[in-house]
Structures are given as C-alpha cells and as structure tokens.
Amino acid sequence: MSGRPIDIHDPDHWEREAAEMRAERAADERTPADPPIAQRDGGHDHADYPPLELLGVDHTGSTQDGPPAWLGSVPPPYGEHLTEFGNARRLIRQHGEDMRFCHPWGKWLIWDGSRWAPDSTGEAARRAKATIVGIYREAAGAASPDMRKALSSFAIKSEKASAIAAMLKIAESEPGIPILPAALDANPYLLCVENGTVCTRTGTLRGHQREDLITKLAPVTYNPSAMAPTWTAFLDNILENRPDLIQFVKLWLGYCLTGDVSEHCMVVAYGTGRNGKSTLFETFAKIIGDYAGTVPNSLLLAQKNESHPTERARLYGLRLAVCSETGAGRLLDESSLKKLTSGDKIDARRMREDFWDFEPTHKLVLYTNHPPRIRTTDEGTWSKVLLLPFKLMVKLCWAAVELPKFLLPYPNTP
C-alpha cells in the first residue's frame, strides 16, 4: 500500500461545499449599504467579553495551533456562539420584539401588528428557521475563510429539527420573553379593533401598541359617527318598543365592551323560540370577536360534580360569555352563580397545563326558553340575576336571516 493514494470518504464534504456556496451567494447579494454583522443594531457590545488578545486569539479568530478559539470559548467577533444557546440569542436579537412565551400555557405569543396572538400556526418555528437562514448571512460577512467555513457548517447542523426545537426551548427563558397570564389584557377599558385600540371610557381611538399586551381582537372598524338603523329597528321589534328594555339592552351590551365586572350580576334572557334573543346575542358576539365566547351550561347548573377547571378556563379574557338552553325546570347552582359573578379571581387550567388564576372580565348571559329555578329565596342571590323577557314571536326571516345579512360581513361581499 506504500506510495498509493488512499481515498478516505468524508460524509460531510458535500454539505460543507453546499454551505460555502450558499454563503458565497449571500455575500454576492449583500449591498454596499449593508453594515458588517457586528455593527448591526441588536448585536452584542464586545466590551462585555475579554479582549481577544488576552485569550491568545487574533482578530481573525485564529490561533497558531488548533481550531479557531472562538468556536467554543468566547463569542466570535461577529456575534453569538456557534451553539444552541447562541442560536436562541440570535432568535431573540432578530425577532424578540415580537415574541413572548407564556409558561403556564406552554404557548408562544406573536405580535401580529394588532395584538399578541397565541401561536396556533407555527409562526415561532418559522421565525426560528428564518434565524438559521441568517447564519448564512453571518458567514457572508465573516472576516476570514475559517470563520466562513465554521459558520456555514454550523448553519447546516442548525437546520436539524432537534436544533430548531432547542433554539425555541432555550429562548423561552431569555430576559424579556417570559410573560404570565395576569399581565395580558390587564386594562379592562381597552378594546382592540381592526383600525386601532379604543378607550371605552372616552371613546377615543389610538394606534395598536405592543405595550398594551392585548391578545384579543374585535374584527370590526371603529367609527364613532356610524349609524345603525337596522339594529335600532331590530331592538324596537323584539323588545316591544319598550324604552326601558331597549335602554337596558344598550347599556348591558356597552358594559360587555369592557372588562369591568363591578355590577356582579348576570342576565337571563328567556322566552319561547323565534323571539330574537339568540340572534341578538349571537350577532353581538360576532361583532366583538375574540372578546366573546360560549360556555357550557354545566358551569351554572346544579349537578353532582363540580365543573371541570378546563370549563372555567374558557372564561379567561372574555367580556361576553354566552350560555344557552338549560331546559325546563333546571336548577341554577347558587355557589357557582356567586363565584362567577363575584369579581374574585378564578382558578383554571387547560388540558396538560398547571393551574393558573385570572381576574374575571366576563359578563354572563344565559338565554333559554324557560327561566331556570333558584332554590333559595335569598335576596343576595336573586340580586345577581337580571331577568330579560322576550315575549313576542318574531318573523323567522327577520330574526334569523335579515339581521345577520345586514350586520355581518360575508365572504366575497364588499
């Protein structure tokens, strides 16, 4: 075998070649206006690290013997370590302004320009992958061939699913990223709509702000001078043109635009079918979007076992919580009624979550054909229940078809 060439297989050869080619293309695409990586906003202040000379490293990152010292000892001159932690820092540097992680929920929240939306589509992972693409740009701006090769090779390793998951996992605890449920939607008088944030106390509109920490959105455009003749006519019709009932409904729905729960009460809307009560509250629920939701009647009805904590979690952040159809003669659970209207903190959890608590913002509306029964005659309990009668039979086309058609946007319509 002496003197004969030996072909030693290098399994990483083609990956390194491809990475270097990508880095070279990225270098060619950089414009003269692009600053070096180390000079870009959000990079580290290198005064935080020991001078390279004290570590036996020159300004190219090389030593006389062995691999470049910055591969695992100190952050390189252009940015972060070539480690999973370094990638987490890259992610936060590039996208941290728009990312928060709620540990009790185990969920990322992403700023979408209007609110902090829970990540249900993998947006956090997409941003992590974009961060890896940025490593190739780091390679393009490297000060030496050694740096370029090291960065290109590391970028390939970072494309593994396990490396992406590790980047996100480490980033969850980085400063400024963790957030608790109590900090979200904390101002009960702010209402997020498509064209800004409304202060419900003053009626003023301003731009969306990250600092408000709002997670909800009402999918409508706020116009304080808008008129609603169809809505007004509908209220007149289903409430028998009674000014007292009409005024009450307007006040109650306005109250439901806020997170204020100081009235400590709920509404029971009752009456036989086709009287407009479900159309009224379902239409309003669609108008306020994320601020409204349905809850199971097991939250309110007397039963052998206490309601599951996941049912209480559905109340979090709601301003209108609708419960429907309890059946004739069903008993309301007095302790649940008091608990859910008291304004006290509520403990809850979702599946595979630890318990967490929240300040209530919901107003309960139960609509049913038959008013439920309450066993007690205690005045304190009955004071929490406001009965709203719907006595008139409304034409089906008006209550169930015409009103939604005029009030709510449908696909492919202007």
Give the positions of each predicted feature:
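Glycine- and charge-rich intrinsically disordered segments
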Residues: M1-V74
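P-loop NTPase catalytic core of nucleic-acid-dependent motor ATPases
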Residues: M99-G122, R148-K149, A183, L190, ...
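Intein modules and their embedded homing endonuclease domains
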Residues: P50-V220, K395-L396
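Phosphate-sensing "switch" segment of ASCE/P-loop ATPases
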Residues: F358-T361, T377-P414
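Substrate-gripping "pore-loop 1 plus following alpha2 helix"
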Residues: V295-H308, S335-D354, C397-P409, T413
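AAA+/SF3 P-loop NTPase mechanochemical coupling elements
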Residues: T310-G317, R349-Y367
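Conserved nucleotide-binding/hydrolysis micro-motifs of P-loop NTPases
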Residues: T197, G327-A328, N369-I374, K391-K395
